[in-house]
Amino acid sequence: IVGYTLVDAATGRVVGEIESVDDSTMNLLFQVRTADGDEVLVPAHEELIRNIDTEERRMELELPEGLLDL
């Protein structure tokens, strides 16, 4: 999963690259680096995952509304 491109399933927009998985909290989080160099923490819940393409190293996630606006 680390190194995969994270894509917003609703819009098709590339969020960024998954740099690590944070398991220090009750819920897993993907640490994602955006094209602008910002860091975004995204919930890594299986119900949010829409598709994983291992050949393209892409993961589509149904992101919670407004998450990227924070």
Q: What annotation goes with each model-predicted range?
A:
Residues I1-L70:
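Peripheral interaction segments used for macromolecular assembly
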